[in-house]
Amino acid sequence: MGNGIYKVIDKFHIAGNVDILITEGTNVDNNTKSILPEYVLKKEFKEVFRQYKNTFIICSSTDADRLESIYSANKESVRRPFIVDTYQKDILCLIDKYAENEKLLYHFNIDDICSYSPSVEKMDNMMRCHGFVMLLRCSEKFQSYLEKILPWCKPEETCLVYSQYHGYIDKREGNTAFNQKLYDFVEQFRERGCFVKEDLHTFGHASKQDLVRLCEQVNPKVIIPIHKDEKADFASILSDELRARVCEYEYSMDGVDISLDSL
């Protein structure tokens, strides 16, 4: 969470005028792992690209900063073919088009980005010869792509980088964020003997300090924390005054009863 959000709060006089603040709580109970900035992740992506000829990456399709880190890490190191699907390429085109004031931050060259087509044998041949960096999503479409690509990828030359919230693939008991389909999607790489790297995702989630500052500055009537472990105590990080405003299950406002489920 950058300092820009606080400038927006001041500019539009948001503080004290918000009924409900919905905020994440990913790092509420994170007392051990540090939050890595994107430039550190970028360096680690470079090391992965240098070590493995074929790199698959699962990440958010709309996280512009993460996409920039991955794209630039490849461009500044091994310069392998950068492979996406048409949806992801459209997202990158939108970022490139509308981030006119952020040209120093985003450096996507759309002409260098390849949209994968399983029917184009020339693309598969290029990927076999030069290796690749390919962005994935957990879907039937991408599963069909993998069934075509993985058989000719040597396991010792192939890596999957999981760059999303780890809770989605953490199979521990009581983890309500666990996603079986995503877990199976990731595990197929291990079953083939490929290396799976899961620790390149910490930025993009606000620290406890930022969450406290945000709640204090916005000063809403109700605070609803989402995207957190079930046992994480969001209210415990706030002052007594704000703690009383945290609603995780149900609340009433202006005669309306609202129940919160699976947030």
Segments from the language model and where they lie:
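C-terminal regulatory/interaction regions
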Residues: S72, E76-S77, D111-L263
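His/Asp/Glu-rich metal-coordinating catalytic cores
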Residues: M1-D65, S69-E76, P81-I83, A99-E102
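Generic secondary-structure transition motif, activating predominantly at the C-termini of alpha-helices
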Residues: G16, F49, K53, D96-A99, ...
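Positively charged, amphipathic N-terminal segments that serve as targeting/anchoring signals
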Residues: F45, F49, D63, S77, ...
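Short internal beta-strands
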Residues: I22, P81-D90, L160-Q164, I224-I226
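Structural recognition of alpha->loop->beta junctions
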Residues: K11-N17, A99-I113, C194-E198
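Active-site environment of divalent metal-dependent phosphoester hydrolases
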Residues: M1, N27-T32, C59-L67, Y87-L92, ...
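Hydrophobic transmembrane alpha-helix bundles
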Residues: S60-R66, I91-K103, Q217, A232-V246
